[in-house]
Swiss-Prot record:
Organism expressing this protein natively: Arabidopsis thaliana (Mouse-ear cress)
Positions on the Lumenal side per record topology: 1-14, 62-76, 129-144, 249-265, 319-331, 386-390
Cysteines paired by S-S bonds: none
Subcellular location: Endoplasmic reticulum membrane
Function statement: Involved in cellular auxin homeostasis by regulating auxin metabolism. Regulates intracellular auxin accumulation at the endoplasmic reticulum and thus auxin availability for nuclear auxin signaling.
Keyword Nucleotide-binding attached: no
Record-given protein name: Protein PIN-LIKES 3
Membrane topology term: Multi-pass membrane protein
Tissue expression as described in the entry: Expressed in seedlings, rosette and cauline leaves, flowers and siliques.
Length: 390
């Protein structure tokens, strides 16, 4: 009982940090202060997206990744993908039960599928590692490897959000209405061909090729490569190259590396990511307070999916993978895998709704509720996870 209480105190400290920094962002967004208004949040969000997050992911991943560690972490991309797939299934159940308006289906599905694999673990892991007598051993090595796990998790989450969730929300937010075939097109389809069979065969081959070309062009227009290859994704790729190629690693990474100033500079810039992202969350919560129009049943459905059913699924998957020897016995690694199922929705969903122009205010309401209750969920579940893996 005493050990469980100690774990509860350990897991509650990072949540208090999140609440304090979030309250600063909330205060700065008030009309009377107006230091973090709509435009300021937009510009700060761009700085986080293009500068802070890539620097953070690149520096942490390059520092911790090696061939051996990458082999050990092979299950993490699979685990992150499973959080998205299971979340999507739970989101679809929420949609079926609560019957929201059609233009909000993509938002609800996205909130259940995409978790905040960025700044939440980035705050929780270092805070947990710093605690004396924690379940993860030496604080310095805990933070080094823990941040490497989080950086890979953040990179994979970014890829899945901008490939899977982005297109899922786009399809559900903009369902095209199929036009019925015209009389002329039906008439043309029944015309008797007046050309030879050989010419007809050639025309059919040409028609098939043209159809394939049209589909490829249509696919390239629908899939936005800029969103897939986001700055964080590119930074993760560069970090993997540096970490895995030994000569490059010795040149840049380490206390005796000739170009270690590059690593130190990128790390220094990346350290601004966590406070900036957390203050943006605080500013966005104020917007949620001023919004309305979201069905309470849909909000409750998202909360149950994200904070009850998804973490329970995570326990079954991660512990099952451990029993099957798919995951190593390292407690910190298992804790990060479990934590991926218990985080609130990704803040990038707000950016996606802005791109589509639908569900912006409703997204703010969902974020208000989910991040307000995250203080409870991110205390209770990590306590249980630490007890489970210790």
């Amino acid at each position: 009982m005493v050990k469980l209480l100690e774990l509860f105190i350990t897991s509650s400290k990072p949540v208090v940090e999140i609440l304090l920094i979030t309250s600063v962002g909330f205060y700065m967004a008030l009309d009377g202060v107006n230091l973090l208004g709509h435009d300021a949040r937009k510009y700060l969000n761009n700085i986080v997206f293009y500068v802070f997050s890539p620097s953070l992911i690149g520096s942490r991943l390059a520092d911790s990744v090696t061939y051996e560690s990458l082999v050990k972490m092979w299950f993490m991309p699979v685990n992150v993908l499973l959080t998205f797939i299971i979340g999507s299934l739970l989101g679809w159940i929420v949609i079926v039960i609560t019957k929201p308006p059609s233009h909000l289906r993509g938002l609800i599905l996205g909130c259940c599928a995409a978790g905040n694999l960025g700044n939440m673990p980035l705050i929780i892991i270092p805070a947990v590692c710093k605690e004396k007598g924690g379940p993860f051993g030496d604080p310095e090595s805990c933070q080094k490897y823990g941040m490497g796990y989080v950086a890979l998790s953040m990179a994979m989450g970014s890829i899945y959000i901008w490939t899977y969730v982005y297109n899922l929300m786009r399809v559900l937010s903009n369902s095209p209405v199929e036009t019925p075939p015209s009389v002329e097109s039906n008439y043309d389809s029944y015309k008797v061909p007046l050309i030879s069979s050989k010419e007809e065969e050639n025309n059919q081959k040409a028609g098939r090729w043209e159809k394939v070309k049209r589909r490829l062009v249509s696919l390239s227009q629908k899939v936005n490569l800029k969103t897939i290859f986001a700055p964080s994704t590119i930074a993760a790729m560069i970090a993997l190259v540096i970490g895995l190629i030994t000569p490059l690693r010795k040149l840049i990474i380490g206390t005796e590396a000739p170009l270690r100033v590059l690593q130190d500079s990128v790390t220094l810039v990346g350290d601004g990511a966590v406070p900036a992202m957390t203050m943006i969350i605080g500013g966005n919560l104020l917007k949620g307070l001023r919004s309305s129009g979201m069905k309470m049943s849909s909000i409750i459905g998202v909360l149950v999916a994200r904070y009850v059913l998804l973490p329970m699924s995570g326990v079954l998957i991660v512990r099952g993978a451990y029993k099957l020897d798919l995951v190593t016995s390292e407690p910190l690694y298992q804790f990060v895998l479990l934590l991926q199922y218990a985080v609130p929705p990704a803040m990038n969903l707000g950016t996606i709704t802005q791109l589509f122009g639908t569900g912006e205010s409703e997204c703010s309401v969902i974020m208000l509720w989910t991040y307000s209750l995250a203080s409870i969920a991110l205390t209770v579940w990590p306590t249980f996870f630490m007890w489970l893996v210790a």
